[in-house]
């Protein structure tokens, strides 16, 4: 996908058209490209990445504050950290085809940089920085509503949350509690993968169960289910 094709895509998909197209070009330009094109004016993406990181932090914090009025500071902080982890940004860069619009040097292109997570994480932040400078925070919010924020309802960010530690902190607020995880069931699936069921108990009282394709994932699912029960029943 050329830069012109990418511009057409974001216009059609997100109704985004840059007023200053040099900002978009800068956000999608890697340093090695400029090294190989010394006659070309402009910068690489790194300054916009710096700005985009701060914009993401602010807008995500504001979004969570408004969406979850009953959450305490610890819950808001944990979810914000999960959402602005750069590990998730590579996923969203691919989702909106930022990877296809990057201007790379020949060596980086040949080495597979276009699909390198670390670069895609940086480019996401640079794109957010460019969009903020060009059109302001409201347009950034609209874009994130269609991408990052929409993923909350799919439980996408659960992979970045340590539910076992959260459960331990919740249960031990009033003193020591013996928390135990047990593998209750193991099932062989038709695609040769395994499905595990795990339980979590506190002081020998089972709180919840969860399933996953590994024991670790099943225990995490059990902890998440237990937290949900505790949060829905504050007197437990």
Curated annotation (Swiss-Prot):
Keywords: Cytoplasm, Endonuclease, Hydrolase, Magnesium, Metal-binding, mRNA processing, Nuclease, RNA-binding, rRNA processing, rRNA-binding, tRNA processing
Biological process according to GO: mRNA processing; regulation of gene expression; rRNA processing; tRNA processing
GO-annotated molecular function: double-stranded RNA binding; metal ion binding; ribonuclease III activity; rRNA binding
Cytoplasm keyword on record: yes
Gene Ontology CC terms: cytoplasm
Subcellular location field: Cytoplasm
Catalytic activity: Endonucleolytic cleavage to 5'-phosphomonoester
InterPro entries: dsRBD_dom, RNase_III, RNase_III_dom, RNase_III_sf
Enzyme Commission number(s) of this protein: 3.1.26.3
One Pfam family it belongs to: Ribonucleas_3_3
Domain DRBM: residue ranges: 162-232
Binding site for Mg(2+): 49, 122, 125
Domain RNase III: 7-136
Annotated SUPFAM superfamilies: dsRNA-binding domain-like, RNase III domain-like
Entry cofactors: Mg(2+)
PROSITE patterns: DS_RBD, RNASE_3_1, RNASE_3_2
Protein family: Belongs to the ribonuclease III family.
The protein's assembly and partners: Homodimer.
Function: Digests double-stranded RNA. Involved in the processing of primary rRNA transcript to yield the immediate precursors to the large and small rRNAs (23S and 16S). Processes some mRNAs, and tRNAs when they are encoded in the rRNA operon. Processes pre-crRNA and tracrRNA of type II CRISPR loci if present in the organism.
Protein name: Ribonuclease 3
Organism of origin: Leuconostoc mesenteroides subsp. mesenteroides (strain ATCC 8293 / DSM 20343 / BCRC 11652 / CCM 1803 / JCM 6124 / NCDO 523 / NBRC 100496 / NCIMB 8023 / NCTC 12954 / NRRL B-1118 / 37Y)
Lineage of the organism: Bacteria, Bacillati, Bacillota, Bacilli, Lactobacillales
């Amino acid at each position: 996908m050329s830069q012109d094709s990418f511009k057409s895509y974001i216009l059609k998909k997100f109704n985004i058209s840059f007023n200053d197209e040099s900002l978009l070009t800068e956000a999608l330009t890697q340093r090695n490209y400029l090294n190989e094109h010394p006659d070309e004016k402009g910068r690489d993406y790194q300054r916009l990445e710096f700005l985009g990181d701060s914009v993401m932090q602010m807008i995500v914090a504001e979004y969570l504050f408004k969406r979850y009025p009953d959450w305490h500071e610890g819950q808001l902080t944990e979810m914000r950290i999960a959402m602005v982890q750069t590990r998730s940004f590579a996923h969203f860069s691919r989702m909106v085809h930022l990877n296809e619009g990057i201007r790379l040097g020949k060596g980086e292109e040949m080495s597979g940089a276009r699909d390198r997570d670390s670069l895609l994480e940086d480019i996401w932040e640079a794109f957010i920085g460019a969009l903020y400078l060009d059109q302001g925070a409201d347009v950034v919010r609209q874009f994130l509503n269609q991408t990052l924020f929409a993923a909350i309802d799919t439980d996408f960010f659960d992979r970045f949350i340590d539910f076992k530690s959260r459960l331990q902190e919740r249960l031990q607020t009033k003193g020591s509690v013996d928390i135990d995880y047990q593998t209750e069931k193991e099932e062989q699936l038709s695609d040769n993968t395994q499905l595990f069921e795990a339980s979590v108990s506190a002081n020998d009282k089972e709180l919840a169960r969860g399933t996953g394709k590994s024991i670790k994932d099943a225990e995490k699912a059990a902890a998440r289910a237990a937290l949900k029960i505790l949060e829905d029943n504050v007197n437990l």
